[in-house]
From Swiss-Prot:
UniProt name for this protein: L-threonine 3-dehydrogenase
Entry's family note: Belongs to the zinc-containing alcohol dehydrogenase family.
Binding-site list for Zn(2+) 2: C93, C96, C99, C107
Alphabetical list of InterPro entries matching this protein: ADH-like_C, ADH-like_N, ADH_Zn_CS, GroES-like_sf, L-Threonine_3-DHase, NAD(P)-bd_dom_sf, PKS_ER, Zn_alcohol_dh
Keywords on record: Cytoplasm, Metal-binding, NAD, Oxidoreductase, Zinc
Top-level EC class as recorded in UniProt: oxidoreductase
Gene from which the chain derives: tdh
Residues at the active site: T40 (charge relay system), H43 (charge relay system)
Length: 340
């Protein structure tokens, strides 16, 4: 089968012909129809320090997908051939304390599809049935291909009560933009998103934010004043991993505010702890998606009218994957889809 493989310990990804994966009694085999390129895939392509320490070579990469079931293991129940599916990309152990307590997103032994085990940038993917998400007919193929990052956005956006609250989002990448759409959909008052990339700020405007702010040219305090905000932001969603953005968020928060951290800053990032302590801020780290409550909520939001399609800006046949990766890495795109 056709597959995109991290075949060498150097920058690049290569298209290769490899065998169709075997599947076990508790697995399903999925015919891949569409995949989406993630920032993680860009790290793997560029072969940065994180990728060198993490990715086995050779290995098929990719973890965001839509497909149809073509084979079902003999012990699998509740799934059948022909079903439209996506899937949870974190494979958990099932035996650690958090897994046994129903908090599988906190499994200490998680393996990532396309990171620690073969991924979905291929014509077929074998996946444990427990990780497969059957989809209703009114979820489009393009939406289904980006449910994984949409789930990151939903997990972060739903971490705290945002109904009637003023929300600050730092980082207008695809996940930050989708988080903005979510909090607006569920009833936030003012939604402000910041970045230094005008292209992505314009995408955020299309998703209905109150203000999309290029912090190179405008100060948050001025935006808050324009919106009539007197006491700072109630909820912060940090998506950028940028140390300056993180500290700007802390300064902009109201006393008693809540901050969810999804972006990954450098390890030695300093924080002004006076902002945290004297304001009584609550900070929560966000990783992946809650299994599987986040999945139920994000599908329900799509069915109830939330439109995330504007964040999808490019579609390419898989044979043009090199150009697709260049577009994604340029920062001049939203989500980029590969059609199989």
């Amino acid at each position: 089968m056709k597959s995109l493989v991290k075949a060498k310990k150097e920058p690049g990804i290569w298209m290769q012909d490899i065998p169709v994966p075997e599947y076990g009694v508790n697995d399903v085999l999925i015919k891949i129809k569409r995949t989406a390129i993630c920032g993680t895939d860009i790290h793997i392509y560029s072969w940065d320090e994180w990728a060198q320490a993490t990715i086995p070579v050779p290995m098929t990469v990719g973890h965001e997908f839509y497909g149809e079931i073509v084979e079902v293991g003999k012990e699998v129940q509740g799934l059948k051939v022909g079903q439209r599916v996506s899937g949870e990309g974190h494979i958990t152990c099932g035996f650690c304390r958090n897994c046994r307590a129903g908090k599988r997103h906190l499994c200490r032994n998680t393996l990532g599809v396309g990171v620690n085990r073969p991924g979905c940038f291929a014509e077929y993917l074998a996946l444990p049935a427990t990780n497969v998400i059957a989809l209703p007919d009114n979820i489009t193929e393009e939406q289904a291909a980006i449910l994984d990052p949409f789930g990151n956005a939903a997990h972060c956006a739903l971490a705290f009560d945002v109904v009637g609250e003023d929300v600050l989002i730092t980082g207008a990448g695809p996940i930050g933009i989708m988080a903005a759409a979510i909090v607006r959909h569920i009833g936030a008052r003012h939604v402000v998103i910041t970045d230094v990339n005008d292209h992505r700020l314009e995408l955020a405007r299309q998703m209905g934010v109150s203000r999309a702010v290029n912090v190179k040219y405008q100060k948050l305090i001025d935006v808050a004043n324009e919106l009539g905000m007197l006491e700072g932001f109630d909820v912060g969603l940090e998506m950028s991993g940028n140390p300056m953005a993180l500290n700007d968020m802390m300064k902009a928060m109201n006393h008693g505010g809540h901050v969810a951290l999804l972006g990954i800053p450098p390890q030695e990032t300093p924080i002004d702890w006076n902002q945290v302590i004297f304001k009584g801020l609550v900070i929560k780290g966000i990783y992946g998606r809650e299994m599987f409550e986040t999945w139920y909520k994000m599908i329900a939001m799509l069915q109830s009218g939330l439109n995330i399609s504007p964040v999808i800006t490019h579609n390419f046949p898989v044979d043009e994957y090199q150009h697709a990766f260049q577009i994604m890495a340029s920062g001049q795109s939203g989500k980029v889809i590969l059609n199989w």
